[in-house]
């Protein structure tokens, strides 16, 4: 993720273009989800059917905004996130179903950066993950990092990729 958002979206587009098959699904965690959204907007591929965003700050990032204002810490936010925050939201083509998975276990950067709205996953607030184009969303009791290793999250991602909706109980 050392490249900018546009470069990362282009690289993902080239990877998708080189991938065989009629149906392609994407899963992106945090900035990876923003790269997937940027790719969909810039390089739409009709084979991309479903996308799951895990803890992606679609509506902005309080933690990143604080880091960007703090001398010496701006680099921690990363170029892709800095570009996402600075650019207008790209319109998304309607061919892909989008699911948003957020966490509500507040462990991480948000514990030392004041003002992160609750509920949050310790890095991104649930409110920041929302995306109007999403067909479904779910919040699970995991932190930003835990969602990568959580069996429950994996099951929910699989459910969305299979059916276009999460398992709400």
Where would I find each of the regions flagged by the language model?
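A short, charged, and often flexible helix/loop element on the N-terminal side
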Residues: 1-2, 140
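Serine-dependent carboxylesterase/thioesterase catalytic core
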Residues: 2-97, 116, 121
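C-terminal catalytic-base region of ester-bond hydrolases, centering on the histidine
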Residues: 95-169
